[in-house]
């Protein structure tokens, strides 16, 4: 299984969709084939790859097993996408994120 450390060294992914597309293309798979793994249609995989629609957390475990990659990396990108989508259009989004980061660091 490819570890989180190895995945970081592979490429610098910005989104889960980008990572999913790269993994699918590296394995010469069609979107519908990846969709079958997580029991969704190929159209949803297309939307995920284009960052138009998210997948559920439950899908990450299946994708991790199928592509033999660390589930933590998938969860990291999945959660980062969720956060980005919440704050991206907010005028104070980045400040709120930085504030939250500081608060979390102080709690631990």
Briefly describe each language-model feature range.
Residues 28-47:
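Short alpha-helical DNA-recognition segment
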Residues 19, 44-47, 73:
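Residue-level recognition of specific faces of alpha-helices
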Residues 38, 49, 59, 67, ...:
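DNA major-groove recognition helix of helix-turn-helix
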Residues 56-73:
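DNA major-groove recognition helix of helix-turn-helix/homeodomain DNA-binding modules
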Residues 71, 75-108:
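Interfacial/linker helices and their anchor residues that mediate assembly or domain coupling
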Residues 2-26:
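A short, Lys/Arg-rich alpha-helix, primarily the initiator
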Residues 18-34, 62, 96:
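Short basic helix-loop element that most often maps to the first helix and adjoining turn
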